[in-house]
From Swiss-Prot:
Family statement drawn from the similarity comment of this UniProt entry: Belongs to the class-II aminoacyl-tRNA synthetase family. Type 1 subfamily.
Entry-linked Gene3D superfamilies: Bira Bifunctional Protein, Domain 2, GAD-like domain, Nucleic acid-binding proteins
Protein's UniProt name: Aspartate--tRNA ligase
Chain coiled-coil ranges: none
Organism: Haemophilus influenzae (strain ATCC 51907 / DSM 11121 / KW20 / Rd)
Main function: Catalyzes the attachment of L-aspartate to tRNA(Asp) in a two-step reaction: L-aspartate is first activated by ATP to form Asp-AMP and then transferred to the acceptor end of tRNA(Asp).
GO MF terms held by the record: aspartate-tRNA ligase activity; ATP binding; nucleic acid binding
Known partners and oligomeric status: Homodimer.
Residues that coordinate or bind ATP: 218-220, 227, 483, 535-538
Matching HAMAP family: Asp_tRNA_synth_type1
EC assignment: 6.1.1.12
Amino acid sequence: MMRTHYCGALNRNNIGQDVTLSGWVHRRRDLGGLIFIDMRDRDGIVQVCFDPKYQDALTAAAGLRNEFCIQIKGEVIARPDNQINKNMATGEVEVLAKELRIYNASDVLPLDFNQNNTEEQRLKYRYLDLRRPEMAQRLKTRAKITSFVRRFMDDNGFLDIETPMLTKATPEGARDYLVPSRVHKGKFYALPQSPQLFKQLLMMSGFDRYYQIVKCFRDEDLRADRQPEFTQIDVETSFLTAPEVREIMERMVHGLWLDTIGVDLGKFPVMTWQEAMRRFGSDKPDLRNPLEMVDVADIVKDVEFKVFNEPANNPNGRVAVIRVPNGAEITRKQIDEYTQFVGIYGAKGLAWAKVNDINAGLEGVQSPIAKFLNEDVWKGLAERVNAQTGDILFFGADKWQTTTDAMGALRLKLGRDLGLTRLDEWQPLWVIDFPMFERDEEGNLAAMHHPFTSPKDFSPEQLEADPTSAVANAYDMVINGYEVGGGSVRIFDPKMQQTVFRILGIDEEQQREKFGFLLDALKFGTPPHAGLAFGLDRLTMLLTGTENIRDVIAFPKTTAAACLMTEAPSFANPQALEELAISVVKAE
């Protein structure tokens, strides 16, 4: 037998037992007549002692080096009281080695486990990076999450059904990864961006509770929390309303937090998209940050200051204030840095006002814009934002979107910089009632979620007549500023689906070509259905306390969508390309 126990599982209950351990040398210390090693496996680390009492094992241990793969047979003994290590889970015991077997020696590692290695090094030698205890713990947590989800889904009557990986390209927002067909030369499969249409078809097939933990693929520009291939917890239901779907999914996430880290998330508040954007400048607000945006256009619309009065009198403009309690200590240099920061989001500047004495009216205000205000305007502003002595007010004034984006980002930055964001808290919520459509860069209407989301209380005729007023029957789950899941009630009326396609500029010929199978299926007694998808990678990232999504994926890609370890992507064999009838054009 190669193993009877895991290293990290040993404790006082094992004292006196003979055990067989298999793992790696984490650290070695030679104290003359004795040799100690820390031995590591996926469960943790235990100290092993080599004593002259077992001379063969002691002699063999002299040749051990870090990362040798070994087997130890020995007895679990109590550490002397003065040698107990309270920083180790196994710190009350050690193993007295009786036999040592070296499975395999190790070259000097290209990574130093005791130093900060570059991410490039870590990804190139990922199989070594995963030996680090913190990385092993993250993947164990990920496995625990998926195990919990499967149990929950099974207990709640959901069926785990697989959907195809080789499918048809459909416009879902990002670019598809294409797979050429050898049999059908010149044609391509697409790797799925999500199982969206297949899970809707399963509802039409009568499987009223479906789930799947599934790989999805998107060929898009990457950020720190994005990967070209990622994993979704995909869910769809029939005959449930949006609140009922949210209730089930909230129970799942509530239970997941309790099971994984012992945290009770409490009841999730529900907030409309409009309120989230108005108060926090984001559709995924981080409620750990106490700062809020307050609209003041009605107060400043008549001031002799174009920066304020123009957007205040423009239906598409916005003037908003963030009050920072005790922020008057912020220096002019810091204010200049914040002004530069909001410029990234298109803001032309950042007005500010320090409240040196709230009881002194305008006389108590230090601000370059004070000369444009009068006592009534200042009184209105101070009352609206509840200004106090020692505060600073930051003003954003521009088009609605620019002000909202810039001030929303400033709110987050102020929260971090000033230590206002309560990092020890968990703040979940649901965001609902998103706009059905938004304008893209060319000014055309695009679906804010996807084109299969149902509008709320709109007929097809009303939707076609006034699409920009429509509210989507959609919902996102947000935790600490991260969107961890999103879903909607789906369109189940063929006329409504065709109307949405037309609004999005997809004519009847394109509808038949791209979605003919869906439009046909909608004709045959389609049930009302709704669903949701969680990002497993992002959930794991939150539950393990890392800010890098690559830390919770065993073999991730870089931000350039490359695998440094296997050197993928690579050039294809010319013979394989010939069989596929593909010629490669040299990139310019």
